[in-house]
Amino acid sequence: MMLILKLSLLSLLIATPGLLVSGANMITCYGDVQKLHCETGLIIVKSSLYGRTDSTTCSTNRPPAQVAVTTCSLPITTIGDRCNGLPDCELKTDLLGNTDPCQGTYKYYNTSFDCINGNYAVICEHGYSTLDCGNDAILIVNANYGRASSQICSNGLPNGLTQNTNCYAANTLTTVAGLCNGKKSCTVEALNTIFSDPCSGTVKYLTVTYICTKEMVVCEGGSASINCGAQTIKTIWANYGRTDSTVCSTGRPGSQLLNTNCYTSDTLNKVAAGCDHLSTCTIPANNNFFGDPCPNTYKYLRIVYACV
């Protein structure tokens, strides 16, 4: 099950108070280095805007014509794609390659981010590491194979092999998520044969950020009982419906299992309202509670959650 449709996962993490450590905002003039840092925890970008919304920010030594337009704002994902899940992140803004939302105006980047609890692994090229969640399930937050720092995995290497710090393999997140999501443990390798070579002539490394989650599946007519003991519940994802023809299928006619595109849009809200911030909760898996998103289909309730 691919839970990390990237935007929806990050939205859930941003809205998860139990995982939140702290938050910050960073403004960087175009051409300078944007530096995001978490004293404790890992970066999750909430929003990044490129443009200009006032005439004073990043205006020193700029002619009035370059700071006059203050209705210029382009939401971007580049910074989140590269920084999410890292404890520290430095990006040269003139290398981000974003579209110019207002030509002739001197712009800046305004990034708002949170620091969340999570697990972070760095694997040098040709190496491997095992991600381990014990009895819980892995959920990948972000991953990159390439190089964003000249210092990491650089011991004994000539400078020429570590100077390209704008190296990102576009398929890293989906590849690692496909290998690891939902598993208790997962071994990942930092190899060109797995991720391709995004920057030939540069020695690369793999960074992976993940959280450990629990999962519960209850067939229609049953009840989901969650117990986090001394901790409290935080719902990460939930759906009442059917997305798999084999789950909760025993003794059911095939006609009740065919529709695997059945979702209840407010499942997460209802489960969160009944469970979040509590140590225990019980949620019924029935049409009376959730409504019937797909008549004549036998449904089930799937909840992914963390104890925080």
UniProtKB/Swiss-Prot annotation:
Entry keyword set: Glycoprotein, Lectin, Repeat, Secreted, Signal
Keyword Iron-sulfur (UniProt): no
Glycoprotein recorded as keyword: yes
Transmembrane region(s): none
Subcellular location: Secreted
Primary location group: secreted
Listed GO CC annotations: extracellular region
InterPro entries: Lectin_gal-bd_dom, Lectin_gal-bd_sf
Signal peptide per UniProt: 1-23
Gene3D superfamilies tied to this protein: 2.60.120.740
GO molecular function: carbohydrate binding
All residue ranges annotated as the SUEL-type lectin domain in the record: 27-115, 123-213, 218-308
Record: glycosylation sites: N110
Tissue spec. comment: Expressed in eggs, but not in liver.
Biological role: Lectin that binds L-rhamnose. Also binds monosaccharides possessing steric similarity to the hydroxyl group orientation at C2 and C4 of the pyranose ring structure of L-rhamnose, such as L-mannose and L-lyxose.
The protein's name: Rhamnose-binding lectin
Taxonomy of the source species: Eukaryota, Metazoa, Chordata, Craniata, Vertebrata
